[in-house]
C-alpha cells in the first residue's frame, strides 16, 4: 500500500531538494501545479506588501500619562461597574475640565 502511494506521489516530494553540495534541484511540477504555485506566490506577495505598508505607517504607542497601580485598579473596577463607554465619557469630561482650568490659570499668571 505504501509503495503504491510512494510511486504515485514521490515526484511531488522532489520539490526543492537540497543536495549535499548546496545546489537546489529544479522543481518538478505539472502546468496546473505551476499555475497554483504562481497564484500562491502572488497572494503571498500581496500579503507581504500589506504587512510592509502597515509597518511603514505604524507609530510608536506612547502613553499620555502613567497611572499608579491603585488608580488603574480603580479604573478597572469602574469599567466593570459602568462599562467602558461610560467610563471613557466621564474620564474625558474630568480631564478636559482639569486641563482647561490649568490652561486658564497659566494664562492669568502671565
Swiss-Prot record:
It is a multi-pass membrane protein. InterPro entries: Membrane-integrating_Mistic (IPR021078), Mistic_sf (IPR038193). Residues 23-31, 82-88 are extracellular. It is found in: Cell membrane. The keyword Transmembrane applies. Keywords: Cell membrane, Chaperone, Membrane, Transmembrane, Transmembrane helix. The chain crosses the membrane at residues 8-22, 32-55, 67-81, 89-102. Changing residue 13 to A: Decrease in functionality. As a fusion partner, can be used for high-level production of other membrane proteins in their native conformations, including many eukaryotic proteins that have previously been intractable to bacterial expression. Residues 1-7, 56-66, 103-110 are cytoplasmic. Pfam families: Mistic. GO terms for cellular component: plasma membrane. Chaperone that facilitates the production and integration of integral membrane proteins into the bacterial lipid bilayer. Monomer. This is Protein mistic. It comes from Bacillus subtilis (strain 168).
Amino acid at each position: 500500500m505504501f509503495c503504491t502511494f510512494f510511486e504515485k506521489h514521490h515526484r511531488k516530494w522532489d520539490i526543492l531538494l537540497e543536495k549535499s553540495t548546496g545546489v537546489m534541484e529544479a522543481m518538478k511540477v505539472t502546468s496546473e501545479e505551476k499555475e497554483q504555485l504562481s497564484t500562491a506566490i502572488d497572494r503571498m506577495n500581496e500579503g507581504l506588501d500589506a504587512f510592509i505598508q502597515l509597518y511603514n505607517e505604524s507609530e510608536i504607542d506612547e502613553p499620555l500619562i502613567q497611572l499608579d497601580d491603585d488608580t488603574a485598579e480603580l479604573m478597572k473596577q469602574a469599567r466593570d461597574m459602568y462599562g467602558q463607554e461610560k467610563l471613557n465619557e466621564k474620564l474625558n469630561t474630568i480631564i478636559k475640565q482639569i486641563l482647561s482650568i490649568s490652561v486658564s490659570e497659566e494664562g492669568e499668571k502671565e
